[in-house]
Structure formats: structure tokens, C-alpha cells
């Protein structure tokens, strides 16, 4: 039996045993088109998906609905993905987080262009992100990461 089958089986059993609802995923990304693409993909797998375009909007949604999994971009204006993870920890939310990021090009001190996605991704991993995905990534990897995060979330409770 493949690992993903075991993961889905465990998820289905635990979900059926605890409550009669679809697992919920909050997708946080300031790129609306990307957020909608992820939401459509996960909704087709049977998830109840909500999108937030910033960490601040996500914090409100988390307080109101407490999603089962959060998928967040690292780099966003205002409250970014790392700040959101800090907020989750400070407010004692035990929600598995999947962190996503693309290459981010910054202008250095002397005008040089540098790619800085690794520092944010390393910080997210050290803060307990259950999965770290680099854009672009495939649908199967996203679906598997969410299934694993849900299984991880079940063991937390």
C-alpha cells in the first residue's frame, strides 16, 4: 500500500470518528491568482478552502474558523508567513503549517540583485513548518503535503 493511501485512510478514519465535516485549509498568499489556483486544486480533493491575501486577514480567519491546515507564502507585505507562524505560536494555535515560496529578488546594499528565499524557508522550517514547498511545485506534491499535514494535525489533538 502506498504512503499516500495510508495517509488518506488515517485521515478519513480520524475525521469520520471526530466530526462530520470536510477538512478545512486556509491558503494565505498576496498573489490572488495563485491563491485561487491552490484553492481550486484542494477543493477538487474535497477540502473546504478559504483564501486570505495577507497575514492579518489570515489571523482573523484563524480566530473565527480554526482551519485544520494553513498553507502560507513566506514573503508578503505586512504580516508575512514567518510573522503568521509567530502569531500562531504566541496565541497557542496548534495548526500544521505548510510554507510556500518562490524566488524573491532583492536589491542589495550596492544595487546588486540577490535571490533570497532560503533564509525565509530555513526560518519557517526551524519554526516547525510541517512542509516547505518551493514554487513552482506540482499538484501531487501539494496534495500529498496537505494530506500529511492533516495526519500530523490529528496526532496533535
Language-model features, listed with the residues they occupy:
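Non-catalytic signal-transmission and effector/linker regions of two-component phosphorelay proteins
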Residues: 1-24, 140-157
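Active-site residues of response regulator receiver
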Residues: 29, 73, 101
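Charged docking surfaces used in two-component/phosphorelay signaling
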Residues: 36-40, 44
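Acidic catalytic/metal-coordinating carboxylates
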Residues: 53-57, 80-83
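Short amphipathic alpha-helix used as the core "switch/output" element in two-component signaling
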Residues: 60, 82-94
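Active-site beta3 strand of CheY-like receiver
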Residues: 65-71
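Receiver (REC) domain active-site loop signature in two-component systems and cognate sites
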Residues: 76
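Alpha4 helix (beta4-alpha4-beta5 surface) of REC/receiver domains from two-component response regulators
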Residues: 83, 104-131, 140, 144
